[in-house]
């Protein structure tokens, strides 16, 4: 919206008076200008006693981006912020949070905006937004059911529990005690134990003498083991089950007292037909529609307490534009021609994989790509495309490079791109899950038709398979885009996420919420989802974003489930040690790798060892000038199998992804520009090639970021998740310029694929067949005894001058890599037991 720039003289005078009187706090002070193009608010916030956190506000107009605002003043109620935003909004959302995204409550909404102005009051730990200043007189804030025999009542101020009669309508009280036994009888938090078992579908009135009644709400009981055991549903029919004769629906919503199926003839319909669902087993609700329901749109409505909410089916497999409604489809009709469910390239050991990480849009969006379907699934399928100077682009480029697996950044339905306005450039990595089992619509040629995205994604997978490339999907089960507005939370509030002790969403992910994989139905959802993608889309692997949020038992169950489909499916993830309320020994992180066989972890130790920490942009590593890094590089070369307990517990090379760059953080080229600004491009090219040489001759599973082969740059952008195409696109002009460097990477890949010595399949092999030999400072050299009497010497020189390496014998030695060229065929032969390794270069020699 346009901002009015010219103000009348009286307005200027009024603004001047406001500034002069700013110490006087009332709504008069923000009544600045009657301007329908702005919205002005005062937000009052009362912190908990003893608070030490630095809270601020994250605020957004409805359907607009958010911005951070500080509290600017303080009065007798607490802190306050005066905020003015562009736009005439009827609703404004806000979160009380820290800069680290720890939250005090979830999303709150200001809805009393009149003439562009509003004033509200909020209390820490209380989700309610008050339109007038809350009274300091005693009142009940909330009453939560925390077990099947326990209700916790919280009041706004402490009171003497011996002086007030407390009752719960419809249930007998066994005893009443302070929540904190050390607080005495004067407290603002009371624990009530009931005689009878509490019915979670029922709402109870809590009464404290002379106070207004309060209804109970579901609390910690929903996260209890007893709840899980009572309501776990193990069936395979959640979501909709379609046949031409009828479609059945099953929803898991055990705390709902009523549930309805809402059907829509068109995706754009605002009002649907409501059909009462029947209670089923284990907290499920069912409905059946006769006849062929193909093309029907639907949602669910549930009544929890006295409130109805509507949400998309979490198990939905097709959806409307922007994923706001589920859709019934015949999945068999979405298969492309010649689709074969189990047809895929041959693949034996995880260590044989060379993974290439790619964003669908990045591959084709540049005008020079020569690809017609720019930014689409179908763009990945185009063959014979050419770029500047006739270089191969798109699919042909990837195939020519020689990698084995293409790993796609999120291709499930995510929330951060508006599928109705695709004529406007929009970009996002996609780590904003909305519908986990639905393909992203912005990559399809028609997001309005639910089947198109399904068919086109299958065409992409089919084409990659036909070109001897396997497909890995990046999955993001660790959080949802907006927890409070998610289908998980609307349908079963309090269950699918982890919570802090104060009832706020846990935030180990750093994006506002953590899902709770340790709970049975969240675990089941993850297993069901992964196996659905593996079977329906014939996928070959899964990368788990922030895997350390999950528990290792869930990951093992997923490994077990995909083994039954195809044991060659690879699983890997980010096993970071994240601050989420889950016991350390249960986390699916690097420290617990020994408990997770068949699941690989990104090895940040070799990543940072090679180039310097990703959290210290100017810190160097082995390749760019840091000394005494040899031992760290050796551990990376041997797949980290001998790490101590503080850095790794890898038991097998299949558990390690060796990498130096990914979509996160600076590209290696951009990092080198930061750490070595005094070096020219030719020197940085040698550093970059040295890194590639180490990665592709190390044990474990090598992982490459798309464009790494032509030294990709994002122009210094270390977090390009929503940056424009000009930053994120694959630059085919650069590909043409860096042709020699691409050939070098191709040669390294060819070498690795030809000789199994570089991809051993056990720790025992590595320990007995890889031996480090003497080498000068800032140099690592070793020998490998391969199969078929193959014997190699490898040397990596990070010095600025050539070094001499003594070889185990006089050979003759075939030189396969010399820092300038690489491949599986000899460049030349050396008849000597000494070799000069040039500055910032690698040598690979094979005994003839």
Task: List the model feature ranges, each with a label.
Residues 651-812:
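Loop/helix patches that line or flank the sugar-binding groove of alpha-linked glycan CAZymes
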Residues 253, 294-296, 828-848:
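C-terminal beta-strand-rich structural cap/linker in extracellular carbohydrate-active enzymes
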């Amino acid at each position: 919206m346009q901002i009015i720039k010219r103000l009348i003289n009286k307005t200027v005078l009024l603004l001047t008076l406001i500034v002069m009187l700013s110490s006087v706090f009332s709504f008069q002070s923000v009544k600045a200008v009657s301007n329908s193009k702005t919205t002005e608010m005062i937000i009052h916030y009362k912190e908990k006693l003893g608070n030490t956190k630095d809270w601020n506000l994250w605020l957004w107009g409805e359907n607009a981006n958010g911005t951070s605002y500080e509290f600017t003043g303080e009065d007798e109620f607490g802190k306050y912020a005066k905020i003015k935003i562009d736009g005439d909004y009827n609703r404004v959302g806000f979160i009380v949070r820290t800069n680290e995204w720890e939250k005090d409550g979830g999303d709150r909404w200001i809805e009393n905006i009149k003439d562009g102005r509003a004033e509200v009051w909020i209390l820490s730990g209380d989700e309610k937004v008050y339109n007038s200043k809350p009274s300091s007189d005693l009142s009940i804030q909330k009453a939560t059911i925390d077990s099947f025999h326990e209700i916790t009542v919280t009041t706004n101020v402490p009171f003497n529990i011996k002086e007030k009669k407390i009752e719960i309508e419809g249930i007998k009280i066994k005893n009443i005690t302070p929540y904190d036994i050390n607080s005495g009888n004067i407290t603002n938090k009371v624990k009530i134990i009931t005689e009878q078992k509490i019915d979670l579908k029922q709402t109870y009135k809590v009464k404290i003498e002379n106070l207004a009644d309060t209804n109970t709400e579901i609390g910690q009981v929903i996260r209890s083991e007893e709840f899980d055991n009572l309501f776990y549903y193990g069936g395979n029919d959640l979501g909709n089950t379609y046949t031409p004769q009828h479609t059945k629906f099953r929803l898991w919503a055990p705390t709902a007292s009523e549930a309805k199926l809402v059907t829509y003839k068109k995706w754009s319909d605002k009002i649907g037909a409501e059909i009462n669902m029947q209670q089923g087993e284990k907290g499920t609700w069912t409905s059946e529609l006769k006849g062929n329901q193909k093309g029907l749109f639907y949602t669910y409505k549930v009544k929890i307490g006295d409130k109805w909410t509507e949400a998309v089916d979490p198990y939905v497999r097709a959806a409307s534009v922007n994923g706001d409604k589920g859709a019934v489809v015949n999945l068999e009709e979405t298969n492309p021609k010649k689709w074969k469910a189990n047809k895929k390239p041959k693949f034996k050991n995880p260590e044989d994989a060379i993974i290439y990480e790619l964003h669908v849009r990045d591959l084709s969006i540049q005008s020079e790509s020569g690809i017609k379907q720019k930014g689409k699934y179908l763009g990945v399928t185009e063959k014979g495309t050419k770029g500047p100077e006739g270089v191969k682009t798109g699919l042909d480029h990837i195939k020519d490079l020689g990698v084995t697996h293409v790993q796609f950044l999120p291709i499930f339905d995510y929330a951060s791109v508006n599928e109705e306005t695709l004529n406007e450039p929009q970009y996002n990595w996609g780590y904003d899950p909305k519908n986990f089992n639905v393909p992203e619509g912005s990559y399809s040629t028609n997001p309005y038709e639910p089947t198109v995205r399904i068919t086109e994604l299958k065409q992409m997978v089919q084409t990659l398979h036909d070109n001897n490339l396997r497909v890995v999907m990046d999955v993001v089960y660790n959080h949802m885009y907006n927890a409070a507005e998610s289908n998980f939370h609307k349908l079963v509030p309090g269950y699918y996420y982890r919570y802090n002790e104060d009832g706020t969403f846990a935030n180990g992910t750093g994006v506002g919420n953590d899902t709770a994989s340790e709970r049975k139905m969240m675990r089941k959802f993850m297993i069901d989802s992964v196996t659905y993608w593996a079977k329906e889309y014939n996928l070959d692997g899964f990368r788990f974003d922030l895997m350390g949020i999950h528990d290792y038992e869930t990951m093992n169950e997923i490994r077990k489930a995909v083994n039954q489909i195809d044991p060659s499916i690879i699983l890997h993830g980010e096993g970071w040690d994240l601050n989420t309320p889950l016991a350390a020994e249960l986390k699916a992180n690097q420290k617990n790798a020994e408990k997770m066989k068949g699941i690989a972890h990104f090895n940040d130790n070799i990543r940072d060892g090679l180039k310097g920490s990703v959290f210290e942009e100017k810190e160097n590593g082995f390749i760019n000038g840091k000394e005494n890094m040899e031992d760290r590089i050796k551990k990376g070369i041997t797949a980290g199998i001998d790490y101590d307990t503080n850095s790794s517990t890898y038991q097998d090379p299949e558990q390690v992804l060796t990498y130096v760059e990914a979509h996160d953080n600076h590209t290696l080229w951009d990092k080198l520009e930061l750490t070595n600004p005094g070096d020219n491009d030719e020197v940085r090219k040698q550093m970059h090639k040295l890194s590639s040489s180490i990665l592709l001759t190390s044990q474990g599973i090598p992982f490459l970021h798309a464009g790494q082969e032509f030294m990709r740059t994002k122009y210094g952008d270390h977090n390009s998740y929503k940056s424009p195409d000009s930053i994120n696109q694959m630059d085919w002009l650069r590909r043409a310029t860096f042709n020699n460097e691409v050939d070098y990477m191709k040669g390294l890949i060819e070498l690795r694929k030809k000789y199994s010595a570089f991809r051993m399949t056990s720790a025992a092999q590595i320990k007995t067949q890889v031996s480090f030999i003497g080498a000068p400072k800032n140099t690592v050299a070793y020998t490998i005894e391969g199969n078929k009497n193959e014997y190699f010497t490898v040397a990596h020189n990070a010095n600025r001058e050539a070094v001499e390496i003594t070889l185990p014998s006089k050979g003759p030695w075939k030189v396969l890599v010399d820092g300038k060229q690489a491949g599986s065929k000899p460049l030349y032969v050396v008849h000597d037991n000494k070799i000069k390794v040039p500055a910032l270069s690698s040598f690979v020699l094979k005994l003839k």
